[in-house]
């Protein structure tokens, strides 16, 4: 006989970061620096994959399937199952993470993270890991050796390269890897779909990871992943350098804002006031603490626009949302908006 707890995190008040909190423990771990939300485990020594899973409350979930009985008054030609796990903070509790069809196969967090060992052998290290949405989505970020420095003898604006992996335990998303450049000074994610400046075809920024149990297969996936990361960052470097070298005066920056967010024609439901607040926020970010040194460039314009999306916006529709997902780079809607903004900046500044 099984008794299930639908995992909706009722014990703790939901917060905008959307991290999973169970029995007072937050499923998140971060290297050296406390995260902006101030939660989880901070560690100062590099960790193995097993140690990272333990620090982030991601180990020994025993994700599995249980039959979902169909009520006697209903009929169905399909079978459905619960995806369940052992609660990471209370082994006596079993949580339902989702309902899936008969073809669904579970994956343990240990399997998702295991290919990271081969990235570690290539000079990477674990940076963050955690779970959100009540354990339905898990993620980890590996810091890679590759980094970009714009104007090294001047402002020396540094961008580090991370590989983000994430998947779901409710069937909503596959195993996904994303190459995520992060501007160091403000932790602004710049995971953009890049159309090559020199080539017609762009390079991959995100891709699905094939699940394999063999050691040889995992080594091959790691090799391909690092190769894709370097190809992507080659293109990113070209784009960032081209933007940094483009001068942007006050009028041009205003043109960029208007192209991105045209002023409403009608003041419906306070639309003009909301637009003015958005424009003021972007201007403040453009000349503020983190972007002031690159203001007057296309690079500064792009970062002001994308920083607002990561850190300075309000919840859509007044609902709680995962700012962590957006700022970490796996909110698809935010990523699409960043790509739209990057395209606008390039168009206004005539960058190929």
Indicate residue ranges for each PLM-predicted region.
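Intrinsically disordered, low-complexity regions enriched in serine/threonine
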Residues: 10-68, 130, 146-352
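A short, surface-exposed helix-loop junction/capping segment
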Residues: 75-103
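Short beta-strand element of the conserved SAM-dependent methyltransferase core
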Residues: 83-85, 140-145, 178-181
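Amphipathic alpha-helical segments
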Residues: 102-126
């Amino acid at each position: 006989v099984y008794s299930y707890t639908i995992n909706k995190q009722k014990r703790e008040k939901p917060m905008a970061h959307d991290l999973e909190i169970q029995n007072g423990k937050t499923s998140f771990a971060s290297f050296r620096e406390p995260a902006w939300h101030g939660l989880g485990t901070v560690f100062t020594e590099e960790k193995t994959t097993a140690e990272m899973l333990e620090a982030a409350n991601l180990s020994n979930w025993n994700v599995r399937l249980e039959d979902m009985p169909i009520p006697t008054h209903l009929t169905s030609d399909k079978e459905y199952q619960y995806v369940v796990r052992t609660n990471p903070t209370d082994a006596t509790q079993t949580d339902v993470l989702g309902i899936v069809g008969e073809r669904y196969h579970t994956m343990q967090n240990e399997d998702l993270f295991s290919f990271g060992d081969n990235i570690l052998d290539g000079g990477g290290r674990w940076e963050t890991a955690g779970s959100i949405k009540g354990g339905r989505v898990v993620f980890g970020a590996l810091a890679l050796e590759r980094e970009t420095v714009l104007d090294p003898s001047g402002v020396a604006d540094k961008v580090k390269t991370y590989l983000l992996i994430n998947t779901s335990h409710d069937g909503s998303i596959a195993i996904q890897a994303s190459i995520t450049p992060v501007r160091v000074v403000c932790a602004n994610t710049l995971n953009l779909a890049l159309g090559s400046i020199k080539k017609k075809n762009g390079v991959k920024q995100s891709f699905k990871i094939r699940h394999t149990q063999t050691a040889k297969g995992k080594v091959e996936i790691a090799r391909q992943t690092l190769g894709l990361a370097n190809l992507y960052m080659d293109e990113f470097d070209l784009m960032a350098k081209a933007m940094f070298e483009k001068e942007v005066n006050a009028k041009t920056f205003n043109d960029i804002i208007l192209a991105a967010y045209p002023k409403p024609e009608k003041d419906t439901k306070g639309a003009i006031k909301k637009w003015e607040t958005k424009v003021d926020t972007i201007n403040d970010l453009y000349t503020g603490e983190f972007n002031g040194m690159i203001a007057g460039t296309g690079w500064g314009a792009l970062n002001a626009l994308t920083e607002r999306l990561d850190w300075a916006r309000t919840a859509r529709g007044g609902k709680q949302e995962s700012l962590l997902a957006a700022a970490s780079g796996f909110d698809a809607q935010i990523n699409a908006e960043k790509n739209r903004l990057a395209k606008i900046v390039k168009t206004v500044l005539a960058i190929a």
